[in-house]
């Protein structure tokens, strides 16, 4: 049996977009399939049925300052894998992947990077859907042909995730509700909130929804809690504007999004939760 290791530090949206690659690798090759991943985003792959093992490292290990720790972590895996697929784009990760041994496949943006790989995907069109770029790794590997139509995202939602959300809905006596997540650009590797809506615009959106009589659930991670509280303080709708940031885990949040009548978000991991739930026109991003 082939043994394949994936390396991807994060973030949540990127890992969700990588799930078609993970699924196809397992289904087409029946291989041992493991992934080295950053802790903060690893929640996107919890209970993924196609992965044998998540090797979770501290997010700081993937920075330049953390290079010695990443090197030790990868070297500990040396000789255990036949192929290493690097899902991060920078040549640095291709170089580090050689510590594992095996045949390294990844992305290139320079001639130097080509020398580090036995098979390479040229990363040239940043507007192309990343899920397709991830499938390119399988295609160029020669191990199997990638199916570019099989791009549904995998996110495992357990019964306990569903029950937690349904209990909240019952407790608050909610019928129809809208979910809003204003996030993006605040994670283990960036902190400036570059993909968030500016305060004036998010307040205008929320005020418009509330004036229509809608109940709005402000979801998100713990890092979004303070921003959401600020919105509550500026909008006087205590019964219909509810801050849920940090209340539910990723899978439960995805289920909540699927239960909503409409979902508003930004270019962040939450957008991919909506895609995973296949809510289509009920999402505005």
Protein language model features and the residues they cover:
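Catalytic machinery of carbohydrate-active enzymes
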Residues: 1-285
